[in-house]
Amino acid sequence: MDAKTQAKYEARAKIIKSMAHPTRLFIVDELARTGERCVWELTEMVGVDMSTVSRHLAMLKNVGIIEDEKRGSQVYYSLRCRCATDFFECVESVMKCNAKDQQKLLAS
């Protein structure tokens, strides 16, 4: 693999890795559903402390999945690329395929 191809796959892996936590998946799903949320809203919804939610948001922002906008004393987060929800559809398809395979094994 040449350096350009390697860099492309490393960038992809970094983005996918940023989604590899249930809380971050929830945040992305919630932002896709509602359009935007501020930190305290997400903190209440997730049920963990604000610093933990802030770390999750920072990771998602760092790879370009979400963006923020400061309004007064609040910071609102939204999806930067709505195509992030396509990732969920792909994951759901894989889960369905896996479930079908598991059912076939159990039926054997």
Map each language-model feature to its residues:
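Amphipathic alpha-helical dimerization/coiled-coil segments
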Residues: 1-11, 33, 82-108
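Alpha-helical residues within the helix-turn-helix
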Residues: 44, 61-62
